A protein has these predicted regions:
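Catalytic core of DAGKc-family lipid kinases
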Residues: 8, 41, 80-84, 90-224
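N-terminal glycine-rich "phosphate-gripper" loop used for MgATP/nucleotide binding
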Residues: 64-68
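Short acidic/glycine-rich loop or secondary-structure boundary segments that cap or lie
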Residues: 158-161, 205-207, 230-234, 258-262
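A generic structural signal for short beta-strands and their flanking turns/coil linkers
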Residues: 191-193, 218-220, 244-249, 300-302
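ATP/NTP phosphate-donor binding region
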Residues: 1-62, 72, 76, 134, ...
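Gly/Ser/Thr-rich active-site loops/lids in small-molecule metabolic enzymes
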Residues: 169-178, 230-233, 238-260
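ATP/nucleoside-binding phosphotransfer catalytic cores, i.e., glycine-rich phosphate-binding loops
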Residues: 211, 242-245, 252-353
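Glycine-rich phosphate/pyrophosphate-binding beta-alpha loops
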Residues: 154, 158, 223-240, 321
Length: 353
């Protein structure tokens, strides 16, 4: 990339690889990047979007040094008027970085920041009320009440897991075992939840796309997915999902047979969506569903509204508890400009032809 880059680095002191921040900063400086400011993500709390301010200060690069939650928290500062975004994957899973083929080693990630290419990628947007159906964008009121996410929005089981896993008390008590302990406790305490789903822009046969039905399910979890890779180093991926297709993947997980659910999720990530003969007895399938795996429902759409008849339920965005149902989730009108490896950019362009 021509010219000297001037960067702000926003980091998370509590991310999984936070102790490597100093090494990462040294590599950035050695690569010729001037670090104008280095600040924790908490410094942005309660502030309006800072992108225009950063540009006015001569900053042309915003580096997110952390995990998925930090990247998601940076979006509102850079998505419209702001420096391009770069990612230093210092989190635990780093699924957003993995979805963009950004190397997990510091030297490789810095090389992408120095010599990568700018790509326009989708981000999700969550609104507490129904989103505007206008193709031209959102009203000022809708946008003011919205939150962005880069990877996944969830309701159900993952909300309780996120609350436990990010608890300072849990982290101090269990250390490296926090995640598995939090997962077991969330499973023990969680009860199925009734949800109502209403889609816009369903992908699938014409007859399915025309359906306006509200769908009701008892679920353990609903995940609205933008970036396809899950599971950190396991590199699990939702088949057919992309961060450049302007669509969200919605997966509803039903119970209560955990062995069946675990097997079905494994098949989903392995690229099998099942066949019509594999649907569980009595299972009703919407015509736009992409899977017949027992215990799972999978759709692809530009927007989904989620409500919970029993009352408001909290949601997570990129693992952070933010907002509650009823909520409308859609692809943001503007893409996010982010630095990616040239090879990823080329493969994505080829796949889109």
């Amino acid at each position: 990339m021509p010219g000297k880059r001037h960067a702000i680095v926003i980091h998370s002191p509590h991310s999984g690889r936070a102790p490597q921040l100093e090494e990462a900063l040294k590599l950035l400086q050695e690569a010729g990047i001037e670090l104008v400011r280095v600040e924790p993500i908490t410094s942005l709390n309660e502030l309006p979007p800072q992108g225009a301010t950063w540009l006015a200060q001569g900053i042309d690069l915003a580096i997110a040094a952390g995990g998925d939650g930090l990247v998601g928290g940076m979006i509102r500062h850079v998505i419209k008027t702001g420096p391009r975004l770069a990612i230093l994957p210092l989190g635990t899973a780093n699924d957003t970085a993995r979805s963009l083929a950004i190397p997990q080693d510091l030297a490789g990630a810095v090389e992408v920041i120095v010599a990568g290419q700018e790509a326009a990628v989708d981000v999700g947007m969550a609104l507490p009320t129904a989103a505007s159906s206008s193709a031209s964008g959102l009203s000022d009121e809708e946008e003011a009440g919205s939150d962005y996410f880069c990877h996944t929005l969830t309701i159900g089981l993952n909300v309780e897991f996120a609350r436990l896993a990010t608890s300072s008390e849990m982290r101090e008590r269990f250390g490296a075992m926090t995640y598995p302990v939090a997962a077991l406790e969330a499973l023990r305490a969680h009860e199925p939840l009734e949800v109502v789903l209403k889609f816009e822009g369903l992908s699938g046969p014409a007859s399915a796309r025309q359906s306006e039905d509200e769908l009701r399910y008892q679920v353990l979890q609903v995940a609205v997915i933008n970036a396809p890779v899950f599971g950190g180093p396991l590199q699990l991926s939702i088949p057919g999902a992309s961060v450049t297709d302007h669509l969200l993947d919605i997966v509803a997980v039903q119970g209560p047979d955990w062995k069946e659910i675990a097997a079905a999720i494994g098949q989903l990530f392995a690229g099998s969506e099942g066949t019509q003969g594999e649907a569980s007895a009595g299972t009703t399938r919407h015509p736009a569903e992409l899977t017949t795996l027992p215990g799972l429902h999978h759709w692809r759409a530009s927007s989904v509204t989620i409500s919970t008849p029993a009352g408001p339920c909290e949601v997570t965005l990129d693992g952070e508890v933010k907002g509650q149902t009823p909520i409308t989730v859609r692809i943001a009108p503007e893409p996010l400009q982010v630095l990616v490896p040239a090879s990823w950019q080329a493969q994505t362009a080829e796949a889109g032809r």
